[in-house]
Structures are given as structure tokens and as C-alpha cells.
């Protein structure tokens, strides 16, 4: 009779090596060298020595994890959040704000091959005015989880506090948890969004099954007692207003209305400073014609219109164009027009572009603006401000402007998301005469 033997499981002992960290990358990972290879080690800071084991070994680099830290950097901080290290939201609470800003600025300078002239920043804590919290019902405990995703996982970290949220939203977390955990429908809840607008606080609840009248009544009572504007979302397309009027926020002296699902910059303080800096960099004059590409609902467009002769905002999403037009009317601005266009096509042939533009601002999504760089060059503006949420696509797009005779006059790191690996930036290009 044949006999079958199970194969012996291979056991490998990972070698412990001692490294010295000399840099911090923009994602908050310590950078060290070992045997001629770059090592990325989460949790370590420059000037720290540690025993580590390699977890991933590639041809050009390797990743490692800390076994034992042997020394502490003078810029090491005690994380404020008890969930830090498990929650995927923040990566850099263990580093001083100054070190975070220096490392991000250095990464930006390397990509752009140009010195970073300034950092545009605001308060490092309590800055986030929007949060989307995942909801998950646990049948064994009959409890509702509410929180953010774990780092590198779809599992939820059940958060009790979040010090990067604006204080009004952080204070709401236990109350929202208690309310949602008391609903009959807690098995059928997807996520809850909290937004702090100038007009007040919004709560948007995504539910995957119809709510009972008792649940609706509980939610309405909760929204009234906490002074919230309540919105219910039975699917991704429908949004029911239960209480509250059109929300709005202040932007450089103007009032911008938005729909609860519209994109708004989550850091109000940096947004205000960013818009003010963009206007200063463009040096907008009363006779200028200014073009704002990827304009959204007018975050830059409307403040520009307070200083220029005329402003054209161009956006690829029709609903945002309508919102921009509405915001222009609400603020009594008659020298600004919004257009819905496919920005991958040649917009320079449109009637509104025939007189050209003196200045151009663009604020594209992460994919960048490769399709419009040649169009901007055709317009021959004197100054261009490019606001970026992805330094890699910014560096790529900048090459076209540099080849066309523009130079980088100013480069700023926008500290829009302190304690995270997100790096945003703003560049001023000037045309060489």
C-alpha cells in the first residue's frame, strides 16, 4: 500500500541586522543603507539606530520592520492618538512637525529639481473638517464598529478619538457611535460622513436597506439635539435631505455653497492660505484676464474674480459648473463665467479663449494635466500657478512648460495633511521674456 508523507514545512529565521537611519521619506518611513541597498523602515526616524529584520527584498531596495530601537531621535514625538500605528490614517505622528515638513519639502525638491522656497501650513492638529467612517456590524458581539481602515488592510480600527479632526467632529464620535449602534438597521449601514462647514455640521449616512420609521425618528431626534444637518443615502446616486439647508464655507471673504458629496479641501486653514498665496503669486491686476482650469465649484475662480477684469473657470463635471455659476451669483460677481469642457480636447479653440489670457491657474486631480499642458503653452500666459496633489505628475507636467521657455519662480510645499504621507504643492511658472 502506498504511503503518503506530508512535506516538511520550511522554516526560515529572519536575520536581525543593525542599521542607522539617515533620512525620512515623504511617507514617514525611515531610510537606511545596508550592503549597498536602500532600506525603508516604518517607525524609525533620522539619527536612530535599530535592530531590524527584512520583510521584503527587491533588487533595488528592501523593506524592514523594527525589532528593537536602540536610540531615539531628538525629533521623536509621543503620538497623540492611541490608534496610531494600527489605523491607516496617519503615518507620521511619531515625528516632529518640523521634521515632517522638511522631509516632504526635500522629496518635492528632488522630484522638481528645484529648491522649495516656502512651506504653506496651518495648525498641525484639529485641522480636518471632513471624515468618512466605515461601519461594520459584528454578529458575535452584536456591536457596531465605526472607524477607519487598518494600514494595508480592509479591517476597521474602531476609533474612539481622532486628534486630526476639527474639535467639533472629534467630540461627535462617541455620540454618533451610540446613536447608530442603537438603530434596528445597524446590520445594514455602510459608512457615515461628518463634515464641518462654516454653516454648521453635516452628517451623511449610507444605508443599504430601507430604514424603519423608528430608526428615522431616532436619527432626526439625534440631528436636532446635536444641531446637525442630516442626509440619508440609500445608494450612491440618491441623497435625501432630512434636515438643514444648503451648506456653505468661507473662502477668502466669499461664501461658497456645496452639496454634501462635493469635494472640498479638508484643511480649511491651509486652503485659505493657499488661495491667498495663489492670488499673490499670479500678481492679478485689474486689467487681467485669468483662466482657471479644473476649477471645481470656484475655490480659486471666485477669489480671482475679486481682483481681475474677467475670469473663466473650466471644469469637466457639469454639476460643479452649475455650482460655480450659482456661487458667482450669490457673491455678486459678474465678471466670471464657468464652462463645462472636456479638458483633454483643445480648449484654445473655444470662443471664450479667443482673446487669450494673461494668467492661468490649474488644480488637477492626481492624474495631473498632461492633456492640457500644450494648450496652456499656446495661450502664452505671463504667469502660471499649478496646484498639485501628486508630485510625480506635477514633475512630469512641468517638463512641458520648462521646454516651452517657462521657469520655476516659486515652489511651495502645502502641508495640507500633517502626520500623513500626503504631499501637496504649488508652483509658479514665469515666462522668460
UniProtKB/Swiss-Prot annotation:
Its EC number is 2.1.1.190. S-adenosyl-L-methionine binds at residues 265, 294, 299, 315, 342, 363. Disulfide bonds: none annotated. GO terms for biological process: rRNA base methylation. InterPro entries: 23S_rRNA_MeTrfase_RlmD, MeTrfase_TrmA_AS, MeTrfase_TrmA_CS, NA-bd_OB-fold, SAM-dependent_MTases_sf, TRAM_dom, U5_MeTrfase_fam. Pfam families: TRAM, tRNA_U5-meth_tr. Keywords: 4Fe-4S, Iron, Iron-sulfur, Metal-binding, Methyltransferase, rRNA processing, S-adenosyl-L-methionine, Transferase. GO terms for molecular function: 4 iron, 4 sulfur cluster binding; iron ion binding; RNA binding; rRNA (uridine-C5-)-methyltransferase activity. It is an enzyme of class 2 (transferase). The keyword rRNA processing applies. The active site is at 389 (nucleophile). Belongs to the class I-like SAM-binding methyltransferase superfamily. RNA M5U methyltransferase family. RlmD subfamily. Catalyzes the formation of 5-methyl-uridine at position 1939 (m5U1939) in 23S rRNA. This is 23S rRNA (uracil(1939)-C(5))-methyltransferase RlmD. It comes from Shigella boydii serotype 4 (strain Sb227). The gene is rlmD.
Amino acid at each position: 500500500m502506498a504511503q503518503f508523507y506530508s512535506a516538511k514545512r520550511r522554516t526560515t529565521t529572519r536575520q536581525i541586522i543593525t542599521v542607522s537611519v539617515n533620512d525620512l521619506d515623504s511617507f514617514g518611513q525611515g531610510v537606511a543603507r545596508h550592503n549597498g541597498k536602500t532600506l525603508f523602515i516604518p517607525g524609525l526616524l533620522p539619527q536612530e539606530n535599530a535592530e531590524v529584520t527584512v520583510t521584503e527584498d527587491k533588487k533595488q531596495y528592501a523593506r524592514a520592520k523594527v525589532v528593537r530601537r536602540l536610540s531615539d531621535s531628538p525629533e521623536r514625538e509621543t503620538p497623540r492618538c492611541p490608534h496610531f500605528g494600527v489605523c491607516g490614517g496617519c503615518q507620521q505622528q511619531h515625528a516632529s512637525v518640523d521634521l515632517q515638513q522638511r522631509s516632504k519639502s526635500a522629496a518635492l525638491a528632488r522630484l522638481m529639481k528645484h529648491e522649495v522656497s516656502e512651506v504653506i501650513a496651518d495648525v498641525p492638529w484639529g485641522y480636518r473638517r471632513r471624515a468618512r467612517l466605515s461601519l461594520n456590524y459584528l454578529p458575535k458581539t452584536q456591536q457596531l464598529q465605526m472607524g477607519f481602515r487598518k494600514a494595508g488592510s480592509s479591517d476597521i480600527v474602531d476609533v474612539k478619538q481622532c486628534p486630526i479632526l476639527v474639535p467639533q467632529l472629534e467630540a461627535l464620535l462617541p455620540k454618533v457611535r451610540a446613536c447608530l449602534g442603537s438603530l434596528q438597521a445597524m446590520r445594514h449601514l455602510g459608512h457615515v460622513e461628518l463634515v464641518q462647514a462654516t454653516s454648521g455640521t453635516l452628517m451623511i449616512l449610507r444605508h443599504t436597506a430601507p430604514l424603519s420609521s423608528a430608526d428615522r425618528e431616532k436619527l432626526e431626534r439625534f440631528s436636532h439635539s446635536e444641531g446637525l444637518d442630516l442626509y440619508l443615502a440609500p445608494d450612491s446616486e440618491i441623497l435625501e435631505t432630512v434636515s438643514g439647508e444648503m451648506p456653505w464655507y468661507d473662502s477668502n471673504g466669499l461664501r461658497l455653497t456645496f452639496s454634501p458629496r462635493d469635494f472640498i479641501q479638508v484643511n480649511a486653514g491651509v486652503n485659505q492660505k493657499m488661495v491667498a498665496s495663489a492670488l499673490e503669486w499670479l500678481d492679478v491686476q485689474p486689467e487681467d484676464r485669468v483662466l482657471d482650469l479644473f476649477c471645481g465649484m470656484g475655490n480659486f475662480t471666485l477669489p480671482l474674480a475679486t481682483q481681475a477684469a474677467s475670469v473663466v473657470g473650466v471644469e469637466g463635471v457639469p454639476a460643479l459648473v452649475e455650482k460655480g455659476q450659482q456661487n458667482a451669483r450669490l457673491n455678486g460677481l459678474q465678471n466670471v463665467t464657468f464652462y463645462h469642457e472636456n479638458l483633454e480636447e483643445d480648449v484654445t479653440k473655444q470662443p471664450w479663449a479667443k482673446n487669450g489670457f494673461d494668467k492661468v491657474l490649474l488644480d488637477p486631480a492626481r492624474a495631473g494635466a498632461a492633456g492640457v499642458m500644450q494648450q496652456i503653452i499656446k495661450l502664452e500666459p505671463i504667469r502660471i500657478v499649478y496646484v498639485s496633489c501628486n508630485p510625480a505628475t506635477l514633475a512630469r507636467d512641468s517638463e512641458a512648460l520648462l521646454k516651452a521657455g517657462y521657469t520655476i519662480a516659486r515652489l511651495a510645499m502645502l502641508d495640507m495633511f500633517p502626520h500623513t504621507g500626503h504631499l501637496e504643492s504649488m508652483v509658479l511658472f514665469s515666462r522668460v521674456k
